[in-house]
């Protein structure tokens, strides 16, 4: 189904009853082909973490319940879910009666698994769950005094390295791109951990800033950055985690790693979530 038939970028009416058909799938293979990624032999492992903040239903007495959800879509799923369709789908539960929160969780996980063709995991939390904010791990490179003049398209030629081997973690809050269809800004904090030739911080920061006017989905931006770093320095280990700011009641946080037994860098929200 072409992206032009989705609800993204169009005026939409919220359904007042549960409707799984609102979920719009996008094959990962389309964007991966553009990046030269073989979908049958992925160079990474990982997940897309979706945090959802507009989640409500009715209990058996008709009383509303509200909560938040976190869902993990495996990076080897056949499809991703278009974000606006997911928002509309979640809001279709607003007047839907469920026996329990566990039942709501089961329905959503099953629907997401069916649409993505993968085993989606996750959990729904009560609205009064205590939340702690975290900060990205590693060295922040944002205060470097650099001159930037490339905002047209991501430029991987900006990635330079030193002929010395390191194992380190760096981060930046200056990643920004735009939604492929609506053009709305996606603001991201990126955490990069790697073992290999040392990235030159100044040139790498320029590379990240070159995404500023790029029109791509969050997942594709993550895989482009992963691929560009991998091609530039051939690291023994590489992971990237991008935590995007909340937009439309959802934030998307792609994680990619060369390590099959990966663990996410942080389970705490950053301040822009």
From Swiss-Prot:
Catalytic activity: 7-aminomethyl-7-carbaguanine + 2 NADP(+) = 7-cyano-7-deazaguanine + 2 NADPH + 3 H(+)
Location in the cell: Cytoplasm
Gene3D superfamilies according to UniProt: 3.30.1130.10
UniProt keyword Electron transport, yes or no: no
Catalytic residues (positions): 179, 186
Pfam families assigned to the protein according to its UniProt record, in alphabetical order: QueF, QueF_N
Binding site for substrate: 81-83, 218-219
UniProt cross-references to PANTHER family, sorted A to Z: NADPH-DEPENDENT 7-CYANO-7-DEAZAGUANINE REDUCTASE (PTHR34354:SF1)
Subunit structure: Homodimer.
Name by which UniProt lists this protein: NADPH-dependent 7-cyano-7-deazaguanine reductase
Organism (species): Rickettsia conorii (strain ATCC VR-613 / Malish 7)
Origin organism lineage: Bacteria, Pseudomonadati, Pseudomonadota, Alphaproteobacteria, Rickettsiales
Gene that specifies this protein: queF
